[in-house]
């Protein structure tokens, strides 16, 4: 196995006449050591089926193939999706272990196999929606490590009561425990992004309820953080008709109506949903 370095990445891009697209969030990892670190952090093993989103020119893909049983790579850019199998065949002795899907990760509803681990340099402009979509649709994903913008990583891994805690934190917690997993230098990307990057890891946990409850809980979360400085009785008044109605529901859920959304864990939002009327 030969991993790709900066020179090979630039050569591949030149051969494709590829200019990295800002709209697609294309910042390619050019440091093979970082790719190896990400795969190691994700603890990818020989029985794992790895799901990679936005494989780009294949630097992380090759590192994954070196550790996993197989890799499913989802790439929205048709040029990159077409080149990736060729690149892998030139650098890896078992190219059949790679499946490439030329699709938008946000629209994927099924995969040819059930992935067990997500490892990806997620497009920064859609990283949270993509992560939440994958956690929702693919229950076989037990663990994962993703690279995202530093501020997004902090929000995903934030705990109640912190300034970073918000909608991404609580919604991700419905499916998984999310933790920070280290920083990544801008210098490992081409082109270098204008923002800092971090890794976050997740471990799947038992969800608090079914899909009906999830949609109800997520609606409450959205309302609670729409104006995050408002007390919950005010923030939820739009959902339940008035502040007094919201206060009554909160008291039934054993939640202090004067708290703000940023103080509540996912279990507290579930408690509110359990006693609140349906809002669909």
Q: Where in this protein do the model-derived segments appear?
A:
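Catalytic cores of RNA-modifying enzymes
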Residues: 1-223, 251, 262, 271-274, ...
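Active-site-proximal catalytic alpha-helix in oxidoreductases
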Residues: 226
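Catalytic core of IPPT-family isopentenyl/dimethylallyl transferases
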Residues: 255-268
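Short helix-coil junctions and helix-kink-helix linkers
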Residues: 237-239
């Amino acid at each position: 196995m030969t991993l790709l370095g900066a020179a090979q990445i630039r050569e591949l891009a030149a051969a494709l006449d590829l200019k990295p697209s800002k709209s697609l969030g294309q910042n390619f990892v050019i440091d093979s050591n970082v790719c190896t670190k990400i795969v190691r952090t994700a603890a990818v093993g020989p029985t794992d089926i790895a799901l990679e989103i936005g494989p780009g020119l294949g630097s992380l893909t090759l590192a994954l193939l070196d550790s996993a049983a197989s890799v499913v790579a989802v790439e929205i850019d048709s040029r990159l999706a077409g080149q990736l199998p060729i690149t892998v065949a030139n650098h890896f002795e078992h190219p059949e272990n790679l499946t490439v899907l030329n699709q938008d990760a946000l629209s994927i509803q099924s995969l040819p196999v059930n992935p067990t681990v997500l490892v990806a340099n997620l497009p920064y402009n859609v990283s949270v929606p993509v992560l939440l979509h994958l956690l929702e649709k693919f229950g076989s994903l037990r663990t994962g490590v993703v690279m995202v913008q530093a501020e997004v990583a902090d929000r995903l891994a934030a705990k109640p009561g912190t300034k970073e805690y918000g909608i991404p934190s609580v919604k991700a917690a419905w499916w998984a425990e999310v933790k920070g997993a280290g920083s990544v230098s801008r210098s490992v990307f081409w082109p270098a992004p204008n923002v800092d990057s971090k890794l976050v890891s997740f471990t799947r946990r038992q969800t608090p309820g079914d899909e009906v409850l999830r949609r109800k809980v997520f609606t409450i979360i959205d309302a609670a953080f729409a104006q995050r400085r408002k007390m919950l009785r005010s923030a939820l008044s739009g959902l339940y008709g008035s502040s007094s109605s919201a206060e009554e529901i909160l008291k039934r859920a054993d939640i202090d109506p004067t708290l703000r959304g940023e103080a509540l864990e996912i279990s507290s939002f579930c408690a509110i949903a359990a006693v609140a009327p349906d809002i669909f």
